Structure formats: C-alpha cells, structure tokens
Amino acid sequence: MYRSMAILSSLRHAYSQISTRSYLSRSKVGFSSNLSSPLDSFAIVPSRFLWKFRTFSSKPDSMLQLVLENDWSKEVEEGLRKPDMSLTHETAIYVLRKLEKYPEKAYYFLDWVLRDSGLSPSTPLYSIMLRILVQQRSMKRFWMTLREMKQGGFYLDEDTYKTIYGELSKEKSKADAVAVAHFYERMLKENAMSVVAGEVSAVVTKGDWSCEVERELQEMKLVLSDNFVIRVLKELREHPLKALAFFHWVGGGGSSSGYQHSTVTYNAALRVLARPNSVAEFWSVVDEMKTAGYDMDLDTYIKVSRQFQKSRMMAETVKLYEYMMDGPFKPSIQDCSLLLRYLSGSPNPDLDLVFRVSRKYESTGKSLSKAVYDGIHRSLTSVGRFDEAEEITKAMRNAGYEPDNITYSQLVFGLCKAKRLEEARGVLDQMEAQGCFPDIKTWTILIQGHCKNNELDKALACFANMLEKGFDIDSNLLDVLIDGFVIHNKFEGASIFLMEMVKNANVKPWQSTYKLLIDKLLKIKKSEEALDLLQMMKKQNYPAYAEAFDGYLAKFGTLEDAKKFLDVLSSKDSPSFAAYFHVIEAFYREGRLTDAKNLLFICPHHFKTHPKISELFGAAA
C-alpha cells in the first residue's frame, strides 16, 4: 500500500492534470455469460462457426503413434517394418519433427531409419536430429550424431550451425558452443565439396543462364550427388531463379550425368524459391515434385512458411498451409494457432484468409483448441467486427473453453483501436463481474489504447486505478506510458515520471525507453535531465548511451558540459579513452578546435599519445 501511495504521488507530480474520477465504466460491449444451455447458444452461431468432429488417421501418424506410445524395442521395430508402414524420406522428417520433445525416442528412431529401414541418410535428417538433441541438452548423443554425420560424408549446413551455436551459447553450454564452432570451421576447411560448390555458384551468378554457362559447368566434370546439389542451391539462395536454372540443368539431362532429383533436392529447391520474386516458380516446382511422386516435408513447410511470413506474403502462407493440410504430413494445431496469430497481427487482418485457415483445420475432423478460437477472435476484434467476435466467444464456451485474460485483452485492444475507449474501460468491470480479473497485460493494453488515441490524462487515470487494485508497474507498462508522454511532447514530465517510478516502484526501464527519452530531452536542449537519465542507466548496469551526447555537445555544449558528461561516464577512476576521444573528435569535426584541444589538455597523459589522437590532430598534438 505504501508503494502504491508513493507511485500515485509521483504520478500527480509528473502530470498535474490527472482527473481524480475513475474512467472505468460499464459497457454493453463484452461477453455474455448467461447462456441457458450449450445447445441453445450454439443455435445462434452462424454456420461457419459450427465445428464438426470426426476421426482421422494417416500412415505417418500411425508410425508416429507407434513410436510415441511405446518404449523402444524389437517389437516397435517389427511394427515399423509392416507393409502398411512404408517409410519415405518425407515420413522420416515428419516423425522426427513431431518427436522434438522426446530426444531419446527421436534418437532411436533415426538410428533405426539409418541402420535398418533401407532409407538413405541425408543432411536434413541429421540436421533435425542435431537440433532436437541440442534443444533437450542431450550432448553425448549430439556429439555421437555429429561424428557419424561427418564420417558419412554429410555436412553441417550454415542454418543448422547457427541454430545450434545460438542455443549452446546460452547459460552453461558455452564450452560446447566453442567446440561446435571449432568443428564447423574445421569442416569448412576440410570439405572440398564446399569449394567446388562455391566455384559452381560463381559460374552461374556471373551472368544470365546461357549455353556458355552450361559449357563451363560441363567442363568442370562435376560429380553430382544429392549432397552436392543441396550445397550449390544453398550457395545460390540469394539468386533463386538462377538456382532454379541450375536445378533443372542437373536434373534434366543437361549435365549428361544421368543424375535424377530426389525428395531431398526438391525440398532444398523449395526453400530457395520461397521468395517474393520467385513464388510462381516455387509453386511450379511443388507441382513438378508431386508429379515425380515426392511430397514437401514438414521441415521444409515450417521453414518456407516462416520465409513467407517474414516477407509478409500472407496469401501464399495460407495457400501453403492449405496445401500441406491436404497432404499426408499435416502441420500441428500449434502451427495453425501461430498462423492465425500471424494473420491477426496485420494492421487490417484479412478475414477471408483467417477463415480459410480455420476451415481447413476443421476439415481434418480435429477439435479446435482455445488458441485457434482466440486467433479467430483476435482478427475479428482487430477489424471492429465485435458482434461476430461475440459469436466466436459463444462457440468457444460451447466447446468447453471460458474466455480468459487473453480473450478479453483482444476485445479491449479492438475497442481501443476503434476509438471506443469508454467501452474498452467497461470490459474490465465485466471481467471482474464474471470472475476473470484483469492482469497486468490487460491493463497495459487498455492504457496503451488511451495513449495512442491522445488521451494521456485518461491513460494515467487508468494507471492510477490499476495501482489501487494492487498491481505494480512493470518495464513494458512504463515504456507504454513514456510513449504517451512523448506523443504529447511532455518530455520533461516523462523524465520526472520515469525517475520517480525507478525510485518508488523499483522498476527497471528498458534500455530502449532510456534511449528514446534521452534523445527527446536533448532535442529540446535539456542536457541536465538527459545526464540524470544516463547516470541512472549506468546504475542499472546498462551500457551508457553516450553516442547521443557526442553530437549534442559538439553543437550546443560548453566545455563544462563535456566535463560533466565525462564524469557521468567515469568508472572507478576516470572515463575510458573511447569516451574522451569521441567527444574530442565531435568538437574537432564541428570546427571547435580550441575546445577540442582544451579537453585534450585535461585528459590523462597517456591518452594524449594515443595513435588516434595523433591521427586526428597531427604529430603536433
């Protein structure tokens, strides 16, 4: 209670116009809770929300189920050998991806695949296994698999290496990270295949595809294999159309080697072609590989979907999802909910795409999870379709899921986006009435909605109300409120507010929050306040945001200002050479040669003979 009182006092000090009345009033927009029965409520939901359920199985799922539900044994291996369990490379990829949380089962399964199934090893199979073992910290088996991979003539590709290295660099696995880095560097030096792949890439990329390019490639007398073709495609990933030309040349008899593409190389080509300027070619190769009897594997789907999403290719992402759901290697419910979240994150979600995803998932006969319901609801509220959002909520309830803070927060967000702020505030009262108490995220969304709609006074009133409910401010909410001050050009008020929150609420602002506010304060020449924030940054163990001050001091600061700045940057003894040099250099570049030399005069003696100082001023310095 004492902390809340202190914070409220700080709030009034930072922004004197806070209204004392509560702006949280009841509203008609929200969720109904007085449903008479599930059947009655279901009757009012439009047909597109009537989810049907039926059983579904496939050979890949049967194989996965066998491995998941049993300890590894000879009986499991015999079951995997049954005629109705025919194994393909795509099926092996699918099962491994689904076993990501079960490293021991994944390890035994891959061992059986490579030892006893008759399926040829491949870089993608090894890569997935390595990622699983690292994520689950099964390091003994990781190193065994990596050595086996190398002995078999396969390579650790760059993407897999980066994923593994990034995972191992966390916390207590840094020794393994260093060892993997050494392994990768040594592999690159020892592997002659990568050198030849680089030479092929150089030939292909130097101009348009032509008879001359084909002649040069023929003269190289390439030894073609799946592994080599994958290497070249990786080298050509920034030139997808040229990669496709090479792909068709090696597989179409142009190389005169008799080489035929496999599912591994088709999938590798798809990963390269999944870009805005080659999407037509991507779908052409999808059709081509289907005709050849191959399928897109689950690992390729996940990576291509991410590429499409990164490029904001929403329609292609949904088309890809539909394609996979029609095949044997269906994405998981988590993939569906993540896709809906991606679609709802657009400024104006395309509801046609949203419902295409949900209908396609529904067509498999599986029941929708709460995450999927929330994904649909999020898009509807984002575009202001609140009546239909309410229908989804009723369907969710009928399926056994109660609205929670996620669901309500989406409604609050949509109402704020639609500038229906009073109704948004009323949702929080409704939540409490229905026994679902708003959490800090819900309050933050409400407060941010007011800030974005230029209603800082009401945002701060909501904040005060939140404190009275017993919540403490966190870094995210502090950033939201500082943005609200900044939108109103209340930079000094923001600075006071931030410093009081650090003092009274024991909150640690984000580094980006400090940087934003320092930039704004320097913009209005409030260097003293900016220095106070810089000093606070240092106390909270952030790197000092010094670069913002260098240019400011050179244009507007005095020599005394520069000294104060350097004092703030000082550690136990004195500021570093870099701190002194950047300010001296800024003065020099601004034409303030006298001030630059005066600052140099007071810096430690050994700094004056530093090569950079000599280079800046000349030997006479």
UniProtKB/Swiss-Prot annotation:
Coiled coil feature spans: none
UniProtKB keywords: Chloroplast, Plastid, Repeat, Transit peptide
PPR repeats mapped onto the chain: 122-156, 157-194, 262-296, 297-331, 332-368, 369-403, 404-438, 439-473, 474-509, 510-544
Presence of the UniProt keyword Isomerase in the record: no
GO biological process: RNA splicing
Main localisation: plastid
UniProt keyword annotation of Plastid present: yes
Pfam families assigned: PPR (PF01535), PPR_2 (PF13041)
Protein name (Swiss-Prot/TrEMBL): Pentatricopeptide repeat-containing protein At3g48250, chloroplastic
Organism: Arabidopsis thaliana
